[in-house]
Regions:
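Bacterial N-terminal signal peptides
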Residues: 26, 31, 36, 40-60
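N-terminal secretory signal peptides that target proteins for export/translocation
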Residues: 1-39
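A small-residue-enriched
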Residues: 71-138, 250, 274-354, 378, ...
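Acidic, low-complexity, intrinsically disordered peripheral segments
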Residues: 417, 421-428, 442-501
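Sec/SRP-type N-terminal targeting helices
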Residues: 84-88, 101-105, 137-164, 214, ...
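Sec/Tat signal peptide C-region and signal peptidase I cleavage site
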Residues: 61-65
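Periplasmic alpha-helical coiled-coil/stalk elements that build and connect Gram-negative outer-membrane
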Residues: 8, 166-283, 383-390, 410, ...
Length: 501
């Protein structure tokens, strides 16, 4: 029953593709066979003229491409600034982790100290070429620093996943809302036609003295209110298209939703499982807190613990550039040294203060992670409580739509066959065309209310999926990105499917 009422709203869209096909087939037949007009076979000018006329009619048909929800989500994630920033943070965290591990690998530097001879005692080695190597051998703090960098990289990766899910949620919600508004605009357009017909009927009845002038004014008020509703829906659709264009980078005029690409949204509840939920955002906060904790432990291990480093140096010296032989009897050209350095900080107030600072940062990030977890639990409870109310409102709106549809069928039947009552004074009055137009307008209003209630329910369900950490599971049901039809201005005969009941 609901599907029948929704099909009427999309009849104009489906006729676009069918009209294009009919014109193409007619033109093909005219071009091949010619036209017989008044007994004369016209095979020259008339087929060409009709072909040009048909092409003009075909160009007037508003053909457009439709973009699937999967395409919108994919483009939004690629174009999102928050996702790009999260990707940059992930690459930075990965580089820091690599840096923490590479301190154990000796580095190699080469250089030269060529210059004129010094005056008096030589101030430096007359080095033609030199090479130095150094690395960390052992540190009590470095192990904690590596763990901190690994946890920070995990936090950045989870934050990237969280940013992608949030972008997908925003794009999906906007896309579904635009699809709902487009369906409501179709209903409003039909309402406008019925309201115009109602005004014509009231005008005739008022002129005939059947209805009062106030009834005519009421019909005009209804027409004005429906016109205002159309303007509101048009502006709302324009804003939603602009939002999707900003998210995806697509032209505004190319964004037309494909209703069949929207998968069903599962009716989950916050009490479905008694286990604690952890979204990518919460997991990222916990990983960040763990990273700060490891950083604080590493800073606390600096004082009173040995630090061992490795070093090696080679010099190729020359006496012709300096007067080394005057002061050093056993001067050699090639010199090499290697060894380790052991340092034990006994009294270092700077590192002690740094450890206290890191401990405070670790405590702060831990409290922030716990606060985010509590806020997420509160959001789940709020959404779970509102879902029951929204579901009930959706059921009521659908029942009202079904009742209005049944009442419309009754009016149509009585208008066609009569209500079976006599012309007695106490008998029920016969149904008039005015009642039919009012029933049509009411049925379309109830259909729009039902579509709006269903969108509110879908939006709440998506938000709950996100809060429960199941957003990725729903995104997997979107399927591949698709583009149905061709851009506006390119002829095509793609039919627009009917919406799901």
């Amino acid at each position: 029953m609901r599907q029948e009422s929704m099909k009427k709203a999309f009849s104009n869209r489906r006729m676009e593709g069918l009209s294009a096909q009919a014109v193409c087939l007619a033109l093909r037949g005219v071009a091949l066979r010619g036209v017989v007009l008044r007994g004369a076979v016209l095979s020259g000018v008339v087929p060409v003229g009709l072909a040009l006329l048909g092409l003009a009619l075909l160009g007037a048909v508003p053909l457009r491409a439709q973009i699937s929800l999967a395409t919108v989500v994919d483009l939004a994630q690629q174009n999102s600034s928050s996702v790009k920033l999260a990707e940059a943070d992930t690459r930075k965290a990965r580089a820091i982790l690599t840096e923490m591990n590479d301190v154990y690998i000796p580095n190699l530097d080469i250089g030269s100290s060529i210059g004129p001879p010094t005056i008096g005692f030589p101030a430096g080695q007359p080095s033609i070429a030199n090479a130095t190597m150094s690395s960390l051998v052992f540190s009590f703090s470095q192990g904690f620093y590596i763990k901190a960098a690994r946890a920070a990289y995990k936090a950045a990766s989870l934050a990237l996943k969280d940013a992608r899910e949030q972008t997908a949620l925003d794009a999906s919600t906007t896309y579904i809302e635009l699809d709902t508004v487009e369906r409501e605009r179709d209903e409003a357009s039909q309402q406008q036609t019925d309201a115009n017909r109602l005004e014509e009927i009231e005008q005739a009845r008022a002129e005939a003295g059947v209805d009062s002038h106030s009834d005519l004014l009421q019909s005009r008020l209804t027409l004005a209110e429906l016109h205002l509703k159309q303007l509101h829906l048009a502006s709302r659709a324009a804003v939603l298209r602009a939002e999707l264009a900003s998210m995806t980078g697509l032209p505004v005029a190319s964004i037309h939703p494909l209703h069949s690409s929207i998968p069903a949204i599962p009716a989950v509840t916050g009490q479905a499982t008694g286990q604690a939920t952890e979204t990518p955002g919460l997991a990222a906060a916990n990983a960040s807190a763990q990273s700060r904790l490891m950083q604080a432990k590493g800073d606390a291990q600096v004082n009173h613990r040995p630090l061992i480093t490795f070093g090696a140096q080679y010099n190729r010296d020359s006496n012709s550039l300096n007067n080394y032989s005057t002061y050093y009897q056993h001067f050699k050209a090639d010199n090499f040294s290697i060894g380790v350095t052991i340092q034990i900080p006994i009294f270092d107030l700077i590192h002690r203060d740094k450890a206290r600072e890191s401990a405070a940062d670790a405590l702060r990030t831990r409290v922030e992670a716990e606060q985010a977890s509590r806020q997420n639990d509160l959001q789940i409870a709020t959404l779970d409580a509102s879902l029951g109310e929204l579901s009930a409102l959706t059921d009521i709106a659908q029942l009202k739509q079904e009742i209005a549809h049944e009442q419309l069928k009754e009016v149509q039947s009585e208008l066609q066959y009569g209500n079976g009552s006599s012309a007695d004074p106490g008998a029920s009055p016969q149904v008039t065309p005015k009642a039919l137009q009012l029933a049509l307008i009411d049925e379309q209003s109830k259909a729009m209310d039902a579509a709006e209630s269903e969108f509110d329910l879908c939006k709440a369900r998506l938000s709950l999926l996100r809060a429960l950490g199941h957003m990725e599971d729903w995104l997997k049901t979107l399927g591949p990105a698709t583009l149905v039809g061709q851009p506006t201005g390119q002829p095509t005969a793609t039919a627009i499917p009917s919406p799901a009941p």
